């Protein structure tokens, strides 16, 4: 079980990312566009740099949806490898079977 503070911090970051997503994409489009003027591009770069660090989606951490474990995250399930194994053995994940060949 991860610390509650780490889970809450990641949730707060996710909310910040969602809040600034449209602004970030607009600024990044201006920066990437070859047709934008150099002064317009530099203005967009400064505006992007002024945004909070937590507005960047790179700072989000994939965590287990049940207990918040940060490592061994399986994107398909939204759970850690430990939790997937436990739930699969208990039969709580439909369609998941233990491999046998």
From Swiss-Prot:
UniProt feature, compositional bias: Polar residues: 33-45
Cellular component GO terms, alphabetical: peptidoglycan-based cell wall; small ribosomal subunit
Keywords assigned by UniProt, alphabetized: Ribonucleoprotein, Ribosomal protein, RNA-binding, rRNA-binding
UniProt-listed InterPro entries: Ribosomal_uS14 (IPR001209), Ribosomal_uS14_bac/plastid (IPR023036)
Region (Disordered): 28-57
Pfam family, one: Ribosomal_S14
Entries under SUPFAM superfamilies matching the protein: Glucocorticoid receptor-like (DNA-binding domain)
Keyword flag Nuclease: no
BP GO terms, sorted: translation
Keyword Ribosomal protein assigned: yes
Any one GO MF annotation of this record: structural constituent of ribosome
HAMAP family assigned: Ribosomal_uS14_1
Subunit structure: Part of the 30S ribosomal subunit. Contacts proteins S3 and S10.
Family named by the database record: Belongs to the universal ribosomal protein uS14 family.
Role description: Binds 16S rRNA, required for the assembly of 30S particles and may also be responsible for determining the conformation of the 16S rRNA at the A site.
Protein name according to UniProt: Small ribosomal subunit protein uS14A
Species this chain originates from: Mycobacterium tuberculosis (strain ATCC 25618 / H37Rv)
């Amino acid at each position: 079980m991860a610390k509650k503070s780490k889970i809450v911090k990641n949730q707060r970051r996710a909310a910040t990312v969602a809040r600034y997503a449209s602004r970030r994409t607009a600024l990044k489009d201006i920066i990437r566009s070859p047709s934008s003027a150099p002064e317009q591009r530099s203005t967009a770069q400064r505006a992007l740099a002024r945004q909070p660090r937590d507005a960047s989606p790179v700072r989000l951490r994939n965590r287990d949806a049940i207990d918040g474990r940060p490592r061994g995250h399986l994107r398909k399930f939204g759970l850690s490898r430990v939790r997937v194994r436990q739930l699969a053995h208990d039969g709580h994940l439909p369609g998941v079977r233990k491999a046998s060949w």
